[in-house]
Amino acid sequence: MLRLPAVLRQIRPVSRALAPHLTRAYAKDVKFGADARALMLQGVDLLADAVAVTMGPKGRTVIIEQSWGSPKVTKDGVTVAKAIDLKDKYKNIGAKLVQDVANNTNEEAGDGTTTATVLARAIAKEGFEKISKGANPVEIRRGVMLAVDAITAELKKLSKPVTTPEEIAQVATISANGDQEIGNIISDAMKKVGRKGVITVKDGKTLNDELEIIEGMKFDRGYISPYFINTAKGQKCEFQDAYVLISEKKISSVQSIVPALEIANSHRKPLVIIAEDVDGEALSTLVLNRLKVGLQVVAVKAPGFGDNRKNQLKDMAIATGGAVFGEEGLSLNVEDIQPHDFGKVGEVIVTKDDTMLLKGKGEKAQIEKRIQEIIEQLEVTTSEYEKEKLNERLAKLSDGVAVLKVGGTSDVEVNEKKDRVTDALNATRAAVEEGIVPGGGCALLRCIPALDALKPANEDQKIGIEIIKRTLKIPAMTIAKNAGVEGSLIVEKILQSSSEVGYDAMLGEFVNMVEKGIIDPTKVVRTALMDAAGVASLLSTAEAVVTEVPKEEKEPAMGGMGGMGGGMGGGMF
């Protein structure tokens, strides 16, 4: 038997041999000051150049290679930004920081990513230049943030609320790159499901864009057996004024469903059974009665899985005024069902793939309470998947769901259009939330005079304010440049005109922006500026950058290739 010190002596050489592999990470490369900033700025420039070409009504598209499938054609700033990954680590850090600006703006406002990117580049570039001449980066950042606060207040003054469907259509049209059809379809969707209703975007099956409104509760589970079909046309099962039995558990025995069938039959009501599954004797009995006696019944599997299924079934019960059998904590058995336990609906449509419960007879107060619970969950959850599911449930309980089906001749065209529709939808929601300001970069130009009233604490803060003053001209200049005209001349002319006048890049003329429908959501403009200023001014304060030195991969040895010599002779000339 070994004593402990002897065991330790044996372990020590092994630990020494392993130590380099356990403790040694990649080597690091460090750059300081102007060298580091210059390389990062090159990355910022590369990303901003690629994104800036998409800006404005005459902006161009960008083609992105994908690891699978055909290349993606897009005019969406954040999609372009996300696709960029540079080989040089220092340049990539600059690009990634501006990428974060685009992502943050997209998450918060849903649009304005291109504006945020060109603003971030302008602030970072000017900031680097002033710092290299000896200005204090921390004070410059304070000046920048001081200016941003003043502009945010000014934008609120310029903002006007969105009141009419026409204004909603105008906002959507501008964000969809001037596509009026998209603008109108989004306006219609908002009219039908309410301004806070759920609107989803999907691939269409035709050449044209379509709007489908789903009222009531629709879920993606159809009839368990085709023998339940009761219409000659359309392969579906339709009932009016039906009872709904909702069970969390599987239904297999005949005895468990006989009481429900007897009650439904005595009340002369069709019966919809929604359960985890209906099989065995229970299913064969239902099918036989349906075929021989003409029993009005249909069985459907419950949607979703796990907690999501439980929540959806509870939602259905509340919307229809029924109870959930087999629910944990409640000793409700299907055999003991009473008339008041059934959910009640005005209309039911069940197809092979989905079920729709319309005109549920649930209590308004209970439905409102359930909606409030879901809203509270939405406020605290951080998971994107959870948010999506909660929003779907919310829509089914409230005004229904509007589905925008995007049409086109090919997948590439549909995907490009889908990006624009999503942008337009997000911009419209932002406009409804915080109002609108003149578009085309004009709102930021109109905020320049507000900066003259600021009183900086020192010269370096004044430099920060001046940086923002010059940066506010960049979006309008970029839009003009993409339209093929001299940006600085256009900006000067706008500044000399009255406050409502701006440049219509599509027609190449100066117009009243709001009257012409060239408008931006206030939230989008505000978020773009705040995100750009925050990240770009931080970027300017960087004095050292640390990156990993890539490990050199050794070429694999060409072992096992011996024995090839001499055997290839004879006639090989």
Curated annotation (Swiss-Prot):
SUPFAM superfamilies noted in UniProt: GroEL apical domain-like, GroEL equatorial domain-like, GroEL-intermediate domain like
GO biological process, one term: mitochondrial unfolded protein response
Enzyme class, first EC level, given as a word: isomerase
Phosphotyrosine: modified positions: Y227
Entries under CDD domains matching the protein: GroEL
Highest rank taxon of the organism: Eukaryota
Catalytic activity as recorded in UniProt: ATP + H2O + a folded polypeptide = ADP + phosphate + an unfolded polypeptide
PANTHER family given in the database record: 60 KDA HEAT SHOCK PROTEIN, MITOCHONDRIAL
Family: Belongs to the chaperonin (HSP60) family.
Protein name, per record: 60 kDa heat shock protein, mitochondrial
Organism: Gallus gallus
Classification of source organism: Eukaryota, Metazoa, Chordata, Craniata, Vertebrata
